[in-house]
Amino acid sequence: MRKLTILGATGSIGSSTLSVAQQNSDQFEIVALGAGTNVDKMLELCLEWKPKYVAMATQPAADALKELLSAHAINAEVFSGEDGLCHIAQLDEVDTVMAAIVGAAGLLPTMSAVKASKRILLANKEALVMSGQLFIDAVEKYGAELLPVDSEHNAIFQCLPQSIQTNLGRCDLEEHGVSSILLTGSGGPFRYTDVSELEAVTPEMAIAHPNWSMGPKISVDSATMMNKGLEYIEARWLFNASKEQLKVVIHPQSVIHSMVQYKDGSVLAQMGLPDMRTPIACTMSYPKRVNAGVEPLDFTKVGEFTFIAPDFSRYPCLKLAIDACYLGQHATTGLNAANEQAVAAFLANKIKFTDIARINEAVLHKVCANFQNLELDSLESLIDLDRMARRYADEAINKV
């Protein structure tokens, strides 16, 4: 039986992970749950799952949860802050960690799980975007096991031979006959909207994704296609891919989750309904298969598959991310930080939808001008750069 810590338990990935665990209760035990500040949701989860350990991102949230758990006679040990989340990521009695905390906040807890040699189910793409080679080196150094949860990376993973699956970040695609990786994306809710109308997009419009059920931040990232840009950077590190080996294709139906093209002309694609329980179940049970609770794909109802080249005038954030990928670690760390601040400002109605790309571009230029030669050889140096980029972004937001 696999024993799990779920980081980001109250979010959409956490919910889907618990759904898969419930479908296969004889194979998975929930030992620890970690979350941000959603005390009410965490209380519900504790009442249902009875974890031994819980961690909340802030002390007030942890204190409030302790009080509620005591009132319900639940004996879970409650930790707080980044240290608390890192602690439950490296518990001796846990062998598998679902890393699903959104954004840069997930980096240190995920790295703690790596250093404790856990099986890492990586749903937090920002961890790799922010730390790149440092993360890949740590996985090898500490003997951790890395399995990608993002639907696209999981699809690519499933289309690659086992010798690559067990050597992520250090594989040689060409040696295995791979000519290219085709990263698919839906294009978000505004793929057919006139570009001149994008300035008027509201947060409510942006978070209404046509295919996937996701949290607000990732929904906005999907609308700008920054999400695909971050996934592009993550794919570069996970699969040790060159610029020539990575391509982005818009596929509005979200049925083909990504593809791998081989030298002999073969193309392997992973397909399924747009439901995160499928890639989550794949990683939770790897190399076996378990019931994810997902309806089988009915090809007679799919109708057709459409593929479109991305239009960078519509999706400037995607172009920024692809460019940043080859400028260096300072660029991807800085861009990710800027985007988190810009999306938060948009969701708070402080800036327009189209300002997100402008702020990201301004911060990327500033980071590249000031930190191009900075040696990013530790988590501390990456976090310092992340903070500085957020400061630049906040300054740009205040000028809008």
Swiss-Prot record:
Pathway: Isoprenoid biosynthesis; isopentenyl diphosphate biosynthesis via DXP pathway; isopentenyl diphosphate from 1-deoxy-D-xylulose 5-phosphate: step 1/6
Residues reported to bind NADPH: T10, G11, S12, I13, G36, N38, N124, E126, G215
Alphabetically ordered keywords of this record: Isoprene biosynthesis, Manganese, Metal-binding, NADP, Oxidoreductase
Cofactor (UniProt): Mg(2+); Mn(2+)
Reaction equations catalysed: 2-C-methyl-D-erythritol 4-phosphate + NADP(+) = 1-deoxy-D-xylulose 5-phosphate + NADPH + H(+)
Residues that bind 1-deoxy-D-xylulose 5-phosphate: K125, S151, E152, S186, H209, S222, N227, K228, E231
Keyword match NADP: yes
EC number: 1.1.1.267
Pfam family, one: DXPR_C
A GO MF term: manganese ion binding
Keyword Repressor attached: no
Binding-site list for Mn(2+): D150, E152, E231
UniProt-listed GO biological process terms: isopentenyl diphosphate biosynthetic process, methylerythritol 4-phosphate pathway involved in terpenoid biosynthetic process
Residues that span the membrane, as ranges: none
Coiled coil start-end: none
Role according to the record: Catalyzes the NADPH-dependent rearrangement and reduction of 1-deoxy-D-xylulose-5-phosphate (DXP) to 2-C-methyl-D-erythritol 4-phosphate (MEP).
Family: Belongs to the DXR family.
Protein name stated in the entry: 1-deoxy-D-xylulose 5-phosphate reductoisomerase
Organism: Aliivibrio fischeri (strain MJ11)
